């Protein structure tokens, strides 16, 4: 296992649309393992592959309910609206108020290639949307109503 360096704002990979995973190989499994190690090392709740310099549609999340590993995630339903503060491991020292859906439903593959459906609200909903935005080259500061230094 390895801890990746987290890419910060200004890096091109954060602004690119990430490439879908066509086949779940041992390298994808290793990427998931190392991304989780990196997430925990950084005391984060979510991490997308572009944040570690890899343009793949891969996300790991742990909001305190155990790790979620998402390959090629897609938001299939949204409900309500919630305005709250967000931060990002790739934009240290900055927070911003971002409007997100209050609840989401996401489809993604797990590391075994099985389709899973994740329903989230609260922090999980916000984290799912934030990380999937990373896969589209979108950062929270692009959507923030206002930002401030921590």
From Swiss-Prot:
The keyword Chaperone does not apply. InterPro entries: Peptide_deformylase, Peptide_deformylase_sf. Disulfide bonds: none annotated. Pfam families: Pep_deformylase (PF01327). It is an enzyme of class 3 (hydrolase). Binds 1 Fe(2+) ion. CDD domains: Pep_deformylase. Its EC number is 3.5.1.88. The active site is at 131. Transmembrane segments: none annotated. GO terms for molecular function: metal ion binding; peptide deformylase activity. Keywords: Hydrolase, Iron, Metal-binding, Protein biosynthesis. One of its GO terms (biological process) is co-translational protein modification. Coiled coil: none annotated. The keyword Calcium does not apply. It catalyses: N-terminal N-formyl-L-methionyl-[peptide] + H2O = N-terminal L-methionyl-[peptide] + formate. Its cofactor is Fe(2+). Fe cation binds at residues 88, 130, 134. Removes the formyl group from the N-terminal Met of newly synthesized proteins. Requires at least a dipeptide for an efficient rate of reaction. N-terminal L-methionine is a prerequisite for activity but the enzyme has broad specificity at other positions. HAMAP family: Pep_deformylase (MF_00163). Belongs to the polypeptide deformylase family. This is Peptide deformylase. It comes from Desulfitobacterium hafniense (strain DSM 10664 / DCB-2).
């Amino acid at each position: 296992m390895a801890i990746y360096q987290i890419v910060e704002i200004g890096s091109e990979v954060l602004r690119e649309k990430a490439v879908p995973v066509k086949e779940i190989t041992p390298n994808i499994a290793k990427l998931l393992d190392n991304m989780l190690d990196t997430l925990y090392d950084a005391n984060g709740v979510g991490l997308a592959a572009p944040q570690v310099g890899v343009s793949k549609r891969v996300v790991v999340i742990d909001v305190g309910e155990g790790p979620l590993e998402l390959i090629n995630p897609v938001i299939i339903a949204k409900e309500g609206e919630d305005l709250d503060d967000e931060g990002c491991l790739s934009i240290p020292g900055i927070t911003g108020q971002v409007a997100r859906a209050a609840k989401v439903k996401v489809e993604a593959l797990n590391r075994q290639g099985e389709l899973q459906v994740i329903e989230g609200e609260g922090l999980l909903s916000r984290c799912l949307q934030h990380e999937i935005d990373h896969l589209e080259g979108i950062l929270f500061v692009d959507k923030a109503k206002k930002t401030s230094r921590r």
